Amino acid sequence: MIQRAEAVLSVLGELQEATECVGLDALTKVAVEVEQVLAPFPLPTAPCSEISSWQGIDAVAHRLYPGDAPTGLLPLVCKGEGNLLFDAASMLLVGSTSLSLELQVRAVVEMLIWKRYYLCGMIDSKVMLQAARFSLCAEESQDMLNLPIQVLEAIFDADVKASCFHGSFANMWHVYALASVLQCNIYSVYPMYNLKIRPYFNRLIRPRIWSKDTEPLTLHIMWSGDLEAGSVFKPHKFVALIHASDLKIGSPNSEQRMPLVKSLELQNQDTQLSYSNLKNKFNITKSTFYRWKRQSIEYHKKSVARYEAKHFFLTSYKQGKLIPLSQFKELFPEIPRSTYYAWKQELVSCCSLSGGSTGELSPGDSTEQDYWSSPEVKKTPGQGSFANMLAFKYEKLEGERNQNVTLMQEAKKSLQDCIVANTSFPYRIFKRKFPGISRSTYYNWRREAMLFIPFKEHSGSSEEGSDADKSQSPRSQMSPSKFDRQKLSPRVRISRRKHRSLRLAYHHRKMLREEAKMHIRRSKMSFIKFKLKFPTVSSSFYWLWRVSLNRKPEKPAVMSNSEESKSLAISPDVFQKIKTQGMFSFDGNIDCLNGQTEFTMPEYSPPDQSTNDHMFVMDVVALANFKAKAKLFLQQRFEEKAFPTFKEFRSYFPLTPRSTYYMWKRALHHGVPLIHA
């Protein structure tokens, strides 16, 4: 043990000397050597059950212990320098603070070697950086939210250098590094205060690597401190938490342990979170208290479920088999689909940063641990087996990828055939036959097929087509041979039994269009009323029917007998007018028209286009105002940090489609304002 302590002190002196150099390059080289020096000294793999340096129960931490944390844990008093993170871990491992200095040195080495992993390669990197932002303040502030990554990296470098000396203060990244050093889980317990930033600190932290054979043990460490202004919590130290049933102090006789158990029960009764204890201290109502308590418990459960799902997703990716969305939803139904694709996109970005030629996801090719590689030189004995393993995984993935490509080609060909035959069906029916195709892919293929001209290949070669375009005569553009070839182009035969549901859907849409057309002909409804009554009918049908209705010529009125007799009266000046005007080429043969009669046709008045255009402009302006109100509503709610869900947004603006809502939401999150007024 003396040799171990001397080795720790010597390597600590080397690290302190290296901190005088600019940057972390010299310190990283020393850290690689320190890791090799400390490698022969093993660390405890199980928590200590007997506390040798017993100093009592921390009453302040016991009062701050939250209600959603694991029950039956007891905060122990630790004395030392700094905020006692490594002292608390040493108390849990060996029952005293004798191991704290070595844990501090090992954590510094871990942070130096795996710096890029902790800053941007870990799944919880964003959460850890948010916790580091808020570690200096007790509430969420705009300055901390806008703190750039370069400033955080500078703070990280300064923290690493400061950790090489006694009495330094640990941050959240020290907790992550300590979990990787001990290869165990650390449950970070944060009091029920500062609720906006509490989720970043109150969480289960997993190590970077751990043994696959056994489940890693879990150490419980709590943030303790003082309460300021009644409800603002200022953390300044860490406290070790140990199970009361496993606690042994000195010799395990019953006389010494009975008072401890009794005092623990009394303190648990006094410090339970109840409305009667808090109503005099804080100005809150009973409903608010129970709502906060319920939300904390629900958030804790959701956080645990989310972390388990994320850890399972990463583990399956490292093993080279990325589970599809359907299987993932069966295992974790509470995780939404958007979260699944967000995690998948993170892994895709990691693969593209590591040097991949494409952005496609190839599980098993590279993992986080391989990407954020250590500056150490890799050992040569395992290179052959590792290469064989990669070759096997590559062959397996190539087979799966070819199978997926074949399936996608089949789905695309099927959709194109249906659109050519004018029997396209919605996405929900398409998904039953091809469940692996996403909605966006379906609509992209559908748009391509709608723009595709199926008779282009039968109309001749490209040279003939170019010559036809150059010719000026319309007869040359439409030759009989080309017309016959277009007319005799093959058509896709459709089975009646297979497409019975499609025909029923087509007839339903047709009847709906006929009903909408009858409504427009009977009553001149506005565009907004039309969309409210028939939301599934396209807007182009509305304007087509309106224009055809207004342009419809009026039928000539049936003349009565008296009007007919009056109209048959021929004036003698008629023929003279015709002669003087020279209307016809046969002016000399006017006498042959003597026996003809002249009918006076009613005057034809063209429809009033000004009224039509005015109504069209009014409808367009109303639609623009409607969209402007929707954009303004979303932008205001986004600035108030109370962004509505699509269900709530649809209740206010029922005509806005879902895709438009998510397009505006994405623009706001990217910093693009919707309304510049």
Swiss-Prot record:
Entries under InterPro entries matching the protein: Vertnin-like, VRTN_OTU_dom
Residue ranges, compositional bias (Basic and acidic residues): 458-472
Location of the region described as Disordered in the Swiss-Prot/TrEMBL record: 356-376, 458-490
GO cellular component: chromatin; nucleus
Subcellular location(s) of the protein: Nucleus
A GO molecular function held by the record: DNA binding
Entry keyword Transcription regulation: yes
Keywords: Developmental protein, DNA-binding, Nucleus, Transcription, Transcription regulation
A biological-process GO annotation: negative regulation of transcription by RNA polymerase II
Record keyword Transcription regulation present: yes
Function: Functions as a transcriptional repressor that modulates bmp2b expression during dorsoventral patterning.
Protein name: Vertnin
Organism listed in the record: Danio rerio (Zebrafish)
Gene: vrtn
